């Protein structure tokens, strides 16, 4: 490993491997010197100093861990990794009150940048998963954060992702709707809600999501696609036809040809139901130009 390090230079992966080997050899001094050298090699990258603190803490060197975290925070007071690591230090040393204060300072303080709070919350989730996989603690913290700052869309988005990862789709719905209230352009939240509505065949909900989705993101063809289907299911054929025609105005060279083909194919179906055969065949022709394998268009054409 030393020879490889001479060739490619010091890096995290090599240093961590050497650290583990030295620990197995029960040479703690050389093990920690390895990470200390890594931190010295990259003095402006606080990740390595924080990593050194974490390794101190994991190996029972609590005072060294505390001093290292304080050093990081003296250089970068807003360093989320170090702030959370310090909270972990307080927890592991039985200082529950200081632990809770540190967590609250990080997660329930509007002066802390939103991105920092989200990063810390991710660390909080990882720690909770490693310790007990108990979701109640994480959910309780998310609920407190949402009450503290109801206008930040990043926190509820992370909350919804967490709930979905736990199979709690029903509980994620109001959280995702809160995201859209804050930021109607959040396509990820809207598409997740849309997927849920489609699985339940709730076409009124699909309409309620896609209509404002088009206003917020007029270039997103997915919303036109599903809105047209929902209108069709609701027997609003003229509305479906109009929305597909509107969608075609936003087609670009980068648009998925299969989606554009489906627009034309569904327009053909609507024209066919209205006995407008010339328009129907013209639409099917266009569908096959974009996707010669469009089964729906081929069958209807036949």
Which residues are covered by each model-predicted region?
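Alpha-solenoid helical repeat scaffolds
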Residues: 1-302
């Amino acid at each position: 490993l030393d020879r490889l390090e001479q060739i490619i230079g010091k890096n995290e992966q090599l240093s961590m491997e050497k650290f583990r080997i030295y620990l197995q050899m029960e040479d703690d001094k050389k093990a920690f010197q390895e990470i200390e050298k890594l931190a010295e090699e990259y003095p402006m990258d606080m990740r390595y100093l924080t990593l050194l603190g974490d390794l101190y803490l994991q190996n029972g060197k609590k005072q060294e861990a505390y001093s290292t975290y304080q050093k990081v925070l003296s250089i970068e007071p807003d360093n989320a990794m170090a702030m959370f690591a310090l909270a972990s230090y307080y927890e592991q040393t039985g200082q529950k009150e200081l632990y809770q204060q540190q967590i609250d300072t990080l997660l329930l303080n509007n002066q802390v940048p939103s991105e920092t709070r989200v990063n810390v919350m991710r660390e909080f989730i990882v720690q909770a998963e490693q310790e007990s996989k108990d979701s109640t603690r994480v959910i309780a913290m998310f609920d407190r954060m949402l009450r503290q700052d109801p206008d930040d869309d990043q926190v509820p988005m992370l909350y919804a992702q967490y709930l979905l990862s736990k199979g709690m789709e029903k509980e994620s719905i109001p959280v995702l709707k809160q995201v859209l209230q804050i930021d109607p352009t959040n396509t990820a939240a809207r598409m997740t809600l849309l997927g849920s509505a489609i699985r339940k065949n709730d076409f009124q909900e699909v309409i309620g999501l896609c209509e404002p989705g088009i206003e917020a993101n007029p270039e997103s063809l997915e919303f036109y696609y599903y809105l047209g289907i929902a209108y069709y299911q609701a027997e609003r054929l003229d509305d479906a036809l109009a929305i597909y025609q509107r969608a075609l105005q936003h087609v670009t060279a980068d648009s998925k040809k299969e989606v554009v083909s489906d627009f034309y194919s569904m327009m053909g179906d609507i024209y066919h139901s209205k006995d407008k055969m010339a328009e129907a065949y013209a639409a099917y022709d266009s569908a096959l130009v974009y996707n010669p394998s469009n089964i729906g268009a081929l069958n209807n054409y036949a």
